[in-house]
Amino acid sequence: MVRVKICGITSLEDALVAVEAGADALGFVFHDESPRHVTPEQAAGIIAGLPPFIQTVGLFVNRPPAFVNDTATRCRLDLVQLHGDEPPEFCDAVERRVIKAFRVKDISSLDPIRHYRVAAHLLDAYSPKAYGGTGLTFNWDIAAAAKAFGPLILAGGLTPDNVREAVETVKPYAVDVSGGVESAPGRKDAARVREFIRRAKGW
């Protein structure tokens, strides 16, 4: 069964809604330019209130390895998601398992993947304006091809309305959503969270 990560968590209330709906992982954004940005202190407080067996993922964009590792330790993150232009050797310096994000324009966007020894690859839609969270989709046939390189997490413009088709088309290891289940940036809509997870998992 496909796994689901709800990203851009900014409150314990939203986190618990996602957990109760069946989310496998929660994402916390440590990128100042994002409307879903949280501080390490905020994230640590939310994570301390979670039940066991829920994975926590910290999202970073072009931050120094020392900041990434320090934040991961302070917040007790399970995984680190690198969503910027980090090279393979950067991933090797991270002290947690790494999810490396790649922004997809076309099939050539997959070329760098083979150089990264990471826990999973995340594919998101390319935008010149932002590193992620844009709500844009991309060609899912490209995503299906990326599975040859290891566990694939599909992101980019997913919503309750299209996630079932995405899962059936790509058959990814996991799907990742943020804006597609929000009522406003950084505010999750409980009904949309529940419906997204239900449809993603085929319940």
UniProtKB/Swiss-Prot annotation:
Where is the chain membrane-spanning?
none
User: Which controlled-vocabulary keywords does the entry list?
Assistant: Amino-acid biosynthesis, Aromatic amino acid biosynthesis, Isomerase, Tryptophan biosynthesis
Protein's recorded name: N-(5'-phosphoribosyl)anthranilate isomerase
InterPro entries under this entry?
Aldolase_TIM, PRAI_dom, RibuloseP-bd_barrel, TrpF_fam
Q: Which superkingdom heads the taxonomic lineage of this protein's source?
A: Bacteria
Which family, according to the similarity comment?
Belongs to the TrpF family.
User: Which transformation does this protein catalyse, written as a reaction?
Assistant: N-(5-phospho-beta-D-ribosyl)anthranilate = 1-(2-carboxyphenylamino)-1-deoxy-D-ribulose 5-phosphate
Pfam families assigned to the protein according to its UniProt record, in alphabetical order: PRAI
The GO molecular function terms of this record are: phosphoribosylanthranilate isomerase activity
Q: In which pathway does it act?
A: Amino-acid biosynthesis; L-tryptophan biosynthesis; L-tryptophan from chorismate: step 3/5
Q: Which organism is it from?
A: Geobacter sulfurreducens (strain ATCC 51573 / DSM 12127 / PCA)
> Signal peptide: which range, if any?
none
Q: Which GO terms describe its biological process?
A: L-tryptophan biosynthetic process
Question: EC annotation?
Answer: 5.3.1.24
Phylogenetic placement of the source organism:
Bacteria, Pseudomonadati, Thermodesulfobacteriota, Desulfuromonadia, Geobacterales
First-level EC class = isomerase
Indicate yes or no for the key word Amino-acid biosynthesis: yes
